[in-house]
Amino acid sequence: MSDPVLYGLARSVYTRIARLALEEKGVRYTLEEVEIFGSAGVPAEHLARQPFGRIPAFAHEGFTLYETDAITRYIDEAFPGTRLQPQELRARARMNQVIAIIDSYAYRPMIWGVFAARIVAPEEGIASNEMLVAESLTRSRTCCRALEEILGTNCYFAGAEVTLADLHALPILLYFSMTQEGHETLSAHPRLRAWLDAAAARPSVQRTRAKFELAR
């Protein structure tokens, strides 16, 4: 069996979500870096595998796939190792709920609204849009309240074990926590902060650290 190939960027949160699934399952894989944010735009060869120009994309023994949620579920079901999707109905529904919250409500404000303004923009000499930051923080705080309520007293979002929900949420919340506003927001939600600290210590997370974390 040939090793799967993941096309993306190590610094991309969605690429990292897929990498975390591969790491948690103990799957050998190749990460092929595809720069989609450069001045040249999305490479033509990547558009051939992902017509919307997003990352990641995935290939395994002639089977190609894009959309992170589809990729991580395939990884969990195609390879042996620890199950990352609960079998119990309500736990699985909770996992799906958290993934949807991250995609629909958390990703854009936390990453493009706050993280990009506070971490990426200064490195590139770009002024931050403070109105966008303020609006994004309001939305991010709502997400944190909702996620902490879902977490409750559990160790992980769907119960006692790590699932795809945790892997989906972690890269976004980790980047958000690197900003002052994100740190303060998470400090106001101690159960969510404790979840993030514990999840961030997992070997899979340490093995996939990106340049923004390594620089700090």
Task: Please place each PLM-identified region on the residue numbering.
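GST-like domain detector, emphasizing the conserved glutathione-binding G-site
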Residues: M1-A134, C155
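Active-site-flanking alpha-helical
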Residues: A18, D76, I172-L173, R209
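Positions that flank functional sites
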Residues: I36-F37, V162, L214-A215
